[in-house]
A protein has these predicted regions:
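Binuclear metal-dependent hydrolase catalytic cores
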Residues: 1-180, 251-274
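Cap/insert and terminal regions of metallo-dependent hydrolase folds
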Residues: 165-169, 175-271
Length: 275
């Protein structure tokens, strides 16, 4: 099982850290987790065709995690995808997909009629919405989904991926969460988001102290993520979804290592890790 970080950024645009997205691959399977800004460009860089993705899993419906959804769908059609899309996500995903597809319906129908491509199956989308907990098998991967705490977002999820006695945990967006620590127990790798304390300053009325406080409240601070990893007893900790996207890496490693006991891996776009 291989984890590739496609995008390690956040809503703020950064030319080195694209929007949140990850690719999990095995010998037979390709699963995409989230589809933030630039996901199709990152896949192209890897020479992974959108036509070959087996399923898309969404952690939650914040815009930075789904903004390139339609780009993913339309590019898969241009890449000669011949199978329907399987989308798994929180309650609200069906409505989201329906509205996005409706918004582009006229343009899409014009393309279909004029370009006369051999298949339109890429536009057949089957959406499955999560309950609080469950497992899904796709080829040689078992995906376990569980709720995390990203309030005021009502429905947010983390995932475990299982393949050949290996376990990968993806936190999704969450504040420190007991449920995550429960399901991440003894994971071979925990991919966790982080809010880096002290790296963002308030700016007049545009980014107030209250704004920073509220953003911090629904993410996991750098002073706590090491404790989360320690309690989870994960073998490796990889950090992603950096808020902000530019920061002092040495300081972050030092702060997290203090609680975790080991150095975390600072995630970078296109980083591949074999699990």
């Amino acid at each position: 099982m291989i984890l590739t970080l496609l995008g390690t950024g956040c809503p703020k645009v950064d030319n080195k850290r694209f929007g949140p997205s990850n690719l999990i691959t095995t010998l037979n399977t390709k699963i995409l987790v989230d589809c933030g800004s630039g996901v199709t460009q990152r896949l192209e860089k890897l020479k992974v065709s959108t036509a070959d993705i087996d399923a898309l899993f969404l952690t939650h419906l914040h815009s930075d995690h789904v903004i390139d959804f339609y780009q993913l769908i339309i590019s898969s059609w241009h890449s000669y995808r011949t199978k329907p899309w399987k989308i798994f996500g929180p309650i609200g995903t069906k409505k989201f997909v329906k509205r996005i597809m409706k918004a582009w319906e006229d343009e899409r129908n014009l393309r279909i009629k004029y370009e006369q491509r051999s298949s339109t199956r890429a536009f057949n989308i089957k959406v499955t919405e999560f309950s609080d907990y469950g497992k899904i098998k796709i080829k040689d991967l078992i995906i376990e989904f569980f709720s995390v705490d990203h309030k005021p977002v009502k429905y947010a999820y983390g995932f475990n991926f299982y393949n050949k006695n290996k376990k990968l945990t993806i936190s999704g967006d969450t504040r420190p969460c007991e449920n995550l620590m429960k399901f991440a127990q003894k994971s071979d790798l925990l991919l966790h988001e982080v809010f880096i304390e002290g790296e963002i300053k308030s700016v007049n009325k545009m980014r107030t102290k209250k704004t920073l406080h509220n953003v911090k409240l629904y993410h996991t601070p750098s002073t706590i993520v090491g404790k989360v990893a320690k309690i989870s007893r994960c073998k490796k900790l990889v950090l992603t979804h950096f808020v902000p996207t530019s920061f002092n890496e040495k300081n972050l490693i030092k702060v997290v290592k203090k609680d975790y006991g080991k150095e975390p891996i600072i995630g970078r776009d296109l980083l591949k890790i074999k699990i």
